[in-house]
């Protein structure tokens, strides 16, 4: 049985090698451009090739992250960069942008293409189109339950696509690929979709209902994820790869996380994975890094986790060691009474001493003395010791790990040694793994004047086994022919030469060259052909006040959450009939399978009741099966959540839909140029002219905190979320009762002005000008 892949992060070359050594089957890393962790150290092209060769020699793979949105101007630079990485031997490319995906699939037909979680492949009906695009793997959203993962794994397998699941590490409170919080907030220069997320979710906020403050603190900061309790089920489901997050974290973190999951995976396949081992590994992981003192499995159970937030300590929390029992200022010692499951720190490990609210001090352990149920440690300055008192909590913040050289990951080979009359030949063959059956051989003559005794076979085996400083280990040694009298240095020389040759054979086998790209020409252009210019008013929430709908538009767009309520649905249909206007419905850019069934029923009911006034469905489901939408006889428009960022991605996307929003991150002038370049006459461009836009779409409800039966959103339609320092814009939080999710709305920075709309009128396409209206919260009351 082929084992599930363990995929590790690497923020630099040193960590890449550490991850491989520790047992990672594959490593993902980025270069200094075009990746979603651009603030990591990352690798130069030279370092990348060195890392790829190092990994391949040890039967590990390397995936290059190209998981950002890419502009038209950057396209050539990206292609040159990826070409050099593939020439260096990259095994696969992790991609977000659909235009990048198509370009790289064409240029590198033999390189794996992995659809990043940033592509937000959440619905079950997208795998057919992904297969047509040449995708080999989908990185599934972190928000899925075990049942949802299982159904997607089996559907993907029909098309030869495998699935990857995040196993451990930091998580975003927003569904992947849908967060504009960093890109739009404050200066608005740090985009998560462009690799420079400022992590505003880790900051402090206040939540208001009108002028009434409901709660304050780190309201958007989730704990780290850990799926160790679900490991067996994930393997049995058929998941191909378990991914560890952490390209911004240090070598010790990566080494520890890889070793922990390597132990668990091997234990499962060897039949000894049990609760005792799981608890031991969890403790090691908690020491390595956690937020809030524990982990979350998010939604794997199928239920909302109401303990998902990190609490008021959003950084590295540590592992509880015990409490201070006494101090000795003269000796410079702090004595700690150990807790139930203690870990004895080593010299150099950091300890943190805290009261109920804050860290008081931290220090590296110097000397340590163990006693029954206690330890006395040195390392803290006497002046700092004087400020402490018994009863304060002590946490261990890290625990340095060492690894025996014999335990490092290596490639198994079979040695065959042949003694002939005048020479000795050694060949080596890789026994298993991705490099199986690669062979190398070398022959050296026996010195004619050598007069030593014939070599002992055991001595020969010992010398051939001296491979600790290489990427290989001999799993099998065969000796043929009568052993001859020859210097032991000859055997050592053969071993070195053969292993050097086989390593070169392995690394060379991965080098590739790019195919030339085709030069697609768009048929868009300026025209005076018939086209439409319509105005659309979008109302993300009307359930608390249906009177907010005002006349003046051609199309009125409402949330599927509101349209699921018959009273609201009847009201908007009556308004459309009264004003002779049309109705559009926008769907969430992420949803669970249960909501999918509700969506279909609601859309069918709306079509039945509204008839031809039901004009369009707006969603991010670019690659989904469109049969149901077509059957309704309505327009299929794509939302900004699909992240259509360039003219190339727009050109591709228009092949799947009737019209679209470009990404809200696209500069308004650039948006106009892109549209004039590629939009044909039978398509529609939708532009944002006024109002707020979705900054974050989350399966976690910041209003109700995922509490069961909270009933928060039945009373209030919108809440205000404000940063503690008031430096950022006020954000409106709209909770959704059907699935207990939440959308945060904030100001748009790339609104399309009247002048630009006039320029767009020269295009060959229809135009919809959108205005979004949300409640304005003032002075303790909600004003519409």
Where are these regions (language model features)?
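A short acidic, glycine-rich active-site loop
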Residues: 40
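Conserved phosphate-binding/catalytic loop of the ribokinase/pfkB sugar-kinase fold
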Residues: 119-123
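Glycine-rich, highly charged phosphate/nucleotide-binding loops
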Residues: 43-48
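Surface-exposed amphipathic alpha-helical tracts and adjacent flexible/coil segments at the periphery
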Residues: 1-21, 26-33, 37, 49-52, ...
